Regions:
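Residue-level signal for the short linker/turn that defines the boundary of a DNA-recognition helix
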Residues: 18, 28-29, 55-58
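The alpha-helix within a helix-turn-helix
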Residues: 24, 35, 64
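Short alpha-helical DNA-recognition segment
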Residues: 28-46
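Short, charged recognition helix plus adjacent turn
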Residues: 74-86
Length: 86
């Protein structure tokens, strides 16, 4: 499959990044403040907010934790209607 994501996944990454950005702004936090809490570079936080797919998931989790949104990760595949139907 290579490093290029299907367009649909790229769009979803951008939506996730935008949601993280909005959560940061609602909390009146700067990119630098999040980067300091997460112990990563401000550039990495910026990449997350832009939906760049090369950022490791552990960094996403640390950003969610810094925003007190880490429990939201538990919502992934929670219902899994298709899997339950199999």
């Amino acid at each position: 499959m290579g490093t290029k994501l299907p367009r649909k996944l790229e769009q979803k990454m951008q939506v996730v990044g935008e949601q993280i950005r909005l959560a940061r702004l609602r909390r009146n936090l700067s990119i630098a403040q999040i980067a300091e809490r997460v112990t990563c570079s401000p550039l990495t936080v910026s990449r997350i907010e832009k939906g760049v797919p090369t950022v490791a998931i552990c960094i996403y989790l640390r950003v969610l934790y810094a925003l007190q949104l880490d429990d939201d990760i538990l919502l992934l595949a929670k219902e899994d209607a298709m899997g339950k139907a199999l």
